[in-house]
Amino acid sequence: MVKYSREPSNLTRSAKAYGAYLRVHFKNTYETATAIKGMLVKDAKRYLNDVIERKRCVPFRKFRGGVGRCAQAKAFKHTQGRWPEKSCKFLLDLLKNLESNAEVKGLEQSKLRLEHVQVNRAPVGRRRSYRAHGRIIPFLSHPCHVELIAVEDEDHVPRHTSTEKRVVKLNKRELARMRLRTGKSLS
């Protein structure tokens, strides 16, 4: 069994999915996962499909060295963005797994929200590249581990707005400041 870095806030109303040693770039997957954090699962799937079709971009915030600018990043109040297709496909597969895990638990698909999304570095895959004049240089891959936790949203009850005036309780310091400002005693 895989150990998650965090437990969900409500064990009975949550579903988990984990991908280990995924042969996909860590940095691209990190940025893509950060973009979908906090979304509903159905919205995240729609967003990732839009990225694959290049209708929307993934904003690059942390690993942005050498990343070109794109106009689609303005939607995220950013300037740099890309369309990491392979990362999106891997995350879509994990979201599909997450949905089936939620279905087994009897959770409602339309209310699932991604509470926790984490991407960690996996051990580097080492290969060789043979160059001119007998040189050999490393040819590395940077895979990753991804963990997702989705929690079913609760139905929010609207707050009751009363017409009565609320009584504000002040501590001694606040009372003293009010007395100094107004020059009167409040008690």
From Swiss-Prot:
Alphabetical list of Pfam families matching this protein: Ribosomal_L22
Keyword Ribosomal protein among record annotations: yes
Ribonucleoprotein recorded as keyword: yes
UniProt keyword annotations, A-Z: Ribonucleoprotein, Ribosomal protein
InterPro entries: Ribosomal_uL22 (IPR001063), Ribosomal_uL22_euk/arc (IPR005721), Ribosomal_uL22_sf (IPR036394)
Record-level GO cellular component terms: cytosolic large ribosomal subunit
CDD domains per UniProt: Ribosomal_L22
GO biological process: cytoplasmic translation
Molecular function GO labels: structural constituent of ribosome
Family the entry assigns: Belongs to the universal ribosomal protein uL22 family.
Annotated PANTHER family: 60S RIBOSOMAL PROTEIN L17
Name this protein carries in UniProt: Large ribosomal subunit protein uL22
Organism: Theileria parva (East coast fever infection agent)
Gene that produces this protein: RPL17
